[in-house]
Amino acid sequence: LRDYGGAGGLKTVSVRGFGAQHTGVSYDGVLLSECQSGEIDVSRYALDHVQSLRLTVGDNDDIFVSARQAASAAVLAIETLNEVPADCRAHLTAQAKMGSFGYVSPFVRYVQRVADRLTLSATADYTYAENDYPFKLRNGSVVTHERRTNSRMNSGHGEVAAQWQPNDRNRVWGKVYYYDNDRQLPGIVRLYTNVCGERLRDRN
């Protein structure tokens, strides 16, 4: 796992020096793709509703995979929670994380069996951070205390899924997924000024 720059930075996975372009990442059985760089940013997938992580190098024991997934040198498979409640009541999970430099990350998950063989679930999480950490700037004999600017992170993610089991041996599962990340890109640290206005927005 390679991290390019801490909070809000790109995080990729590669196996045995093949590079992130040759390491596939599947999300609930769907192999992901990135048209801009070819490298999947795994930081956008929170672990709050992940059921399992599986890394496969070479051949997969599952024969029901796509040709593109079978051609990958290695595959990181991310499987989300898909349990079926024993009753028909609504089950709600909520949590909130807080940290330094304005970090706030709430998470909520709803799941309910609405019929004997039909289950609905919804998941949403949001992450906000200012990332204005302090640092010292040395300019000859002058030392000033500055704060990182233009480093705000503002991302949200939501999923709605339906699972239908016509019998004990078969399952039909559909999901709607949305991701939106609007973040600022900090520039280099300059003397006398630290103004930077670059932004990046990713929507999936």
How does the language model describe each region?
Residues 47-93:
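A beta-strand signature from Gram-negative outer-membrane beta-barrel systems
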Residues 1-31:
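Extracytoplasmic beta-strand/coil segments of soluble accessory domains associated
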Residues 80, 112, 164-166:
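Residue-level signature of outer-membrane beta-barrel architecture
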Residues 133, 145-155, 163-165, 169-204:
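Flexible loop and strand-edge segments within Gram-negative outer membrane beta-barrel domains
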Residues 94-98, 122-128, 174-180:
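Transmembrane beta-barrel strands of outer-membrane/channel proteins
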Residues 23, 49, 86-92, 97, ...:
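Outer-envelope beta-barrel architecture signal
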Residues 14, 77, 93, 109, ...:
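Outer-membrane beta-barrel architecture
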Residues 11, 72-74, 90-92, 104-108, ...:
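Hydrophobic, lipid-facing positions within transmembrane beta-strands of outer-membrane proteins
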